[in-house]
């Protein structure tokens, strides 16, 4: 993971059970959407390897779970839009939700986290935000 890539995370006080989040997913998806997601996953890895982080805006465009699970998270699209407007390459749902994560350069990570949290706050939803970076050392003895 490139050292310049950071993560703005917002955890809204919205309960999304993994079991329910799985239940909203379709049993089948169109072949075209599946192929598109595979190409985006490949672009995601390539973007990290080549440090071409601007490609993450396309690579993070998911058709397999985000369109369905975002309906479980109030104002999800507004949070994604706020993240991008504040400088994020893109944003997505972390796991089954309700945590949202934006991929952003170090210089903009706090602005993006603040913008994401502000959407929930403005709509009366308590939340916590975090500015994170990847641990590239892996497992180690402390």
Protein language model features and the residues they cover:
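Acidic/histidine-enriched ion/cofactor-binding microenvironments in catalytic or ligand-binding pockets
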Residues: 1-6
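Active-site rim beta-loop-alpha module in soluble metabolic enzymes
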Residues: 8-71
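Glycine-rich, charge-dense phosphate/pyrophosphate-binding loop(s)
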Residues: 48-142
